[in-house]
Design a protein with these regions (language model features):
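Donor/substrate-binding cores of folate-linked one-carbon enzymes
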Residues: 1-102, 109
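Internal anion-binding site segments
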Residues: 97-221
């Protein structure tokens, strides 16, 4: 009998073949993803699918929590389905090539946030890289990277694009091109993550920090 090499892939194939399915489904704002038990073939993630399980993605889920969920589901899928595979009770279903999508290796550039992103895209990218490596913005003063680990939509027209502002001494708000987000977890280089009000306490008399546009960045990394 022919040997069939198997692999577990963290998406609902043929969607999101490639190296970063967990991050990419969060960036794209998907409401569900999954895990597939699949045949390994020469083409990347293109083999027959023998079993799969859907994972719902709530809005507050980030990379860390989704990766943990994927790991749990993958272990259970293998434990439950592998015996059936060896008994010849699982049929390998060919993937629909016309529905295939792909995801790439994550680079540092992917994790830098852009003030021109829509609010949804900005929040989704924060989710996709939280807690590690952390999506970041850069300050005008000293080019200091600040990692944004969680944020929410917020409405305060007084906060202009490119301003990271202390509002009412307790709300840390960042102005984007088409609105604002409330920063609920942020991290300075070499420091532990903190909530917005703790960050504001560390700002002292400074109540606005100016943030660089991604396009202004000098690519010298």
């Amino acid at each position: 009998s022919k040997l069939v090499p198997l692999n577990v892939h963290a998406s609902l194939l043929p969607k999101l073949r490639g190296a970063s399915p967990i991050q990419t489904c969060l960036i794209e704002g998907d409401k569900k993803t999954g895990v597939c038990l699949m045949e390994m073939v020469k083409a990347m993630d293109a083999g027959r699918v023998f079993a799969s399980e859907v994972i719902e993605i709530p809005e507050d889920m980030n990379f860390t929590s989704l990766e943990e969920k994927v790991s749990d589901v993958a272990i259970n899928l293998v434990l439950n389905k592998l015996p059936l595979f060896f008994e010849g009770k699982l049929e390998g279903i060919p993937q629909d090539e016309s529905q295939a999508t792909f995801c790439h290796y994550i680079t540092k550039d992917d994790t830098e946030l852009d003030l021109d992103y829509s609010i949804d895209k900005f929040i989704n990218i924060v989710r996709a890289f939280s807690v590690k490596p952390g999506a970041f913005i850069r300050t005008m003063n000293g080019d200091e990277p600040l990692k944004i680990l969680s944020c929410l939509p917020y409405d305060d027209k007084s906060v202009k694009k490119g301003e990271l502002k202390a509002v009412d001494k307790k709300h840390l708000v960042l102005g984007l091109n088409n609105g604002q987000v409330l920063i609920t977890s942020i991290q300075k280089p070499g420091k532990k993550p903190c909530d917005g009000s703790s960050f504001i306490n560390g700002m002292g008399s400074e109540h606005v920090i100016l943030i660089k546009h991604k396009t202004e960045d000098i690519k010298n990394d």
